[in-house]
């Protein structure tokens, strides 16, 4: 029969089949051959790479540039009040280096720099960016005067494209300009006797480093280093930015390793990364850059910044965390951090953003939900035995570590399976729903989700479960047990006698079976004049200690249509401090549900 139906279906499909020609690409705007317009980036020639065999073992120095690079890229920059709130949040997260402004650009930036200087903890360094111009450098030093720790950050574009197109500057002129700026910063800071109360650090960025020939990047930084004369205790910071991401992350790692192995006095140098995300690889480039020798990472929370943004510091830090390496940053309340970033930047955090997105710890797929539910069941057992390792399918991070709860882990829509609903019921009612009942409830849920055309909320799922299975016999009460007694006839035979109330009348009942439940079901079969049979029964304890209760689940089959002997079945749930009472509640919940369905009619 099945074979013939498949054949008929195939024949029908064959008749309907029509030829669909391949789609021809029009290339309305894109080029058929992009090589006539774009050239592949030429990577540095590396005889031997060390970084591919390394792993990240410790946290880098972190610098947040949210208040400078991030803020300057906002359509509507932060207010002073928002900057202050953001500044203190960065400190509370654990950032020890914060780039707060471009103080020579405006009085507002200058004033905020003064606020940061006066309100930063002693162990937090305040950094400011400045162009390599004398009057701007002097203004920046003025803004930072009095800080416990301060870093002046100068920069100069070093790529051939920028030197030739934007600045019309030779390599020699670029080196001279960078050295001149460095000497001036030195004169006004660490060499000035009146500035000795501040620990002055210096950062130089060969801007567009990722598009700069490696040997020239080293050459200009050597000249800057010689002019600054760093120490091991206070190394010079060479920030090597992917100002525009021009190649794959492995190429950036090669560039970092080349610089790290060719710069002299490496112990007096701190190599910093500052990756933008033009190709979508900012995090990967940063991580490979650390493998290649970078000591420090600059970026923004959730990747704010010019164009496609800077590297997302949350992702880099939490990637380390989930590999067992402490990032020395505290994202325990990532939800509140996300709220502040969203509100101050006026840019929403994508719901799928790693770690911070609303949906990153949520599973809608049925197979995912089932795996997660099983993972938690095993995890709970192992934790009771002293195991601390986190090992849950599809969840590389314990949501509680970032302040999320487990309620958000499993979400139910029309695509969800039985595991998702079972998880919600376990979390809301404490019930470990038996697998056959999960399948039954899943069908009910999917129909509801399809009808609504949206995700079902946890409270909606719980309400639907209670209504569907007459939870604890609290709905649709047609038959009520008044009293009963079970007598032992022989080792395998029991008799139940009792009274029920039905249609406002007290009726005697009597039934037989191998135990109390089967005897009660037999008695109700006689009462309703329909054959009821126990198809599935399970129970488990609920809670612990003096508050322990019992939960019982029962599935009863019955003849739905006496003419063709069609059968159906229904589930019910009962909860009570007494196991026997829970079982009885489950039976009556099921029977009353059957009556409510209209499949079985009460006698007048």
Curated annotation (Swiss-Prot):
Binding site for a divalent metal cation: 69, 274, 276, 310
Residue stretches making up the Pyruvate carboxyltransferase domain: 60-335
Catalysis: reaction(s): 3-methyl-2-oxobutanoate + acetyl-CoA + H2O = (2S)-2-isopropylmalate + CoA + H(+)
Keyword Transferase attributed: yes
Cofactor(s) the record lists: a divalent metal cation
Listed name of the protein: 2-isopropylmalate synthase 2, mitochondrial
Organism of origin: Saccharomyces cerevisiae (strain ATCC 204508 / S288c)
EC number(s) given by UniProt: 2.3.3.13
Pathway(s) served: Amino-acid biosynthesis; L-leucine biosynthesis; L-leucine from 3-methyl-2-oxobutanoate: step 1/4
Functional summary from the UniProt entry: Catalyzes the condensation of the acetyl group of acetyl-CoA with 3-methyl-2-oxobutanoate (2-oxoisovalerate) to form 3-carboxy-3-hydroxy-4-methylpentanoate (2-isopropylmalate). Redundant to LEU4, responsible for about 20% of alpha-IPMS activity. Involved in leucine synthesis.
GO terms classed as biological process: L-leucine biosynthetic process
UniProt subunit comment: Homodimer.
Other facts: Present with 28800 molecules/cell in log phase SD medium.
A Gene Ontology term for the protein's cellular component: mitochondrion
Null allele phenotype: Retains 79% 2-isopropylmalate synthase activity and grows in the absence of Leu; a double LEU1-LEU9 deletion has no 2-isopropylmalate synthase, does not grow in the absence of Leu.
InterPro entries named in the record: 2-isopropylmalate_synth_dimer (IPR013709), AIPM/Hcit_synth_CS (IPR002034), Aldolase_TIM (IPR013785), IPM_Synthase (IPR005668), LeuA-like_post-cat (IPR054692), LeuA_allosteric_dom_sf (IPR036230), LeuA_N_DRE-TIM (IPR039371), PYR_CT (IPR000891)
Major enzyme class: transferase
Keywords in alphabetical order: Amino-acid biosynthesis, Branched-chain amino acid biosynthesis, Leucine biosynthesis, Metal-binding, Mitochondrion, Transferase, Transit peptide
GO molecular function, one term: metal ion binding
Pfam entry (one): LeuA_dimer
Residue range of the transit peptide in the UniProt record, numbered on this chain: 1-50
Subcellular localization: Mitochondrion
Annotated family: Belongs to the alpha-IPM synthase/homocitrate synthase family. LeuA type 2 subfamily.
Keyword presence, RNA-binding: no
